[in-house]
């Protein structure tokens, strides 16, 4: 139907393209070995902070909107301060966030805090997560946490996190916490 080519290349620029691609491949190889805070390694245009990243809700009432302006309808309201959310995008003063159940929406940046928190997760609703006295499954159990408990992150080793909350402080397996990335270290 269409006889026009989608893209054409000038034969005179071909050697330049090969050199450029070679340099790009070398640079990509060097950067692949560089440590990155998160899988994508992107920096948010609005904040200058990594995207994605975990933050927490500052308030007991946070409107989540369908888009990044007050003109967009409120899709739902969070009613739990300290809940961890993942910032997945930025637009001016708005942050697209994802909660631990996978729901996504837009929140005004001042309603978010850089304080790191986690939600305790379990493989079933009846399962509890042991909180140990040390970063070791053999360490004494100091508490058992129900799924949905919110805790403050004190430190993560990449496999264990020291967390605390009202009436508890100890170490939990990092894989059982939503609000920290796999293998992420937090000091």
Language-model region placement:
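N-terminal signal peptide c-region/cleavage motif recognized by signal peptidases
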Residues: 33-35
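Sec-dependent signal peptide recognition
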Residues: 17-24
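SH3-family beta-barrel domains
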Residues: 38-66, 77-81, 88-91, 98-100, ...
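Surface-exposed aromatic
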Residues: 161
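Beta-strand-rich domains and repeat architectures in extracellular enzymes and scaffolds
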Residues: 73-74
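N-terminal secretory signal peptides that target proteins for export/translocation
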Residues: 1-16
């Amino acid at each position: 139907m269409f006889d026009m080519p989608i893209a054409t290349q000038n034969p005179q620029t071909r050697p330049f393209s090969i050199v450029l691609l070679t340099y790009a491949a070398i640079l990509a190889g060097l950067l692949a070995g560089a440590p990155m805070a998160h899988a994508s390694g992107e920096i948010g245009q609005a904040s200058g902070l990594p995207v994605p990243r975990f933050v927490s809700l500052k308030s007991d009432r946070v409107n989540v909107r369908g888009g990044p302006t007050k003109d967009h309808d409120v899709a739902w309201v969070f009613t739990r301060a300290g809940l961890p959310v993942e910032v997945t995008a930025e637009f001016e003063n708005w942050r697209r966030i994802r909660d631990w159940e996978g729901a996504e929406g837009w929140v005004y940046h001042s309603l978010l805090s850089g304080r790191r928190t986690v939600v305790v997760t379990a493989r079933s609703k009846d399962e509890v997560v042991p909180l140990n006295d040390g970063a070791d499954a053999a360490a004494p159990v100091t508490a058992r946490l129900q799924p949905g408990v919110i805790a403050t992150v004190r430190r993560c080793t990449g496999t264990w996190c020291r967390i605390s909350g009202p009436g508890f402080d100890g170490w939990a397996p990092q894989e059982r916490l939503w609000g920290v990335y796999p293998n992420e270290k937090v000091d």
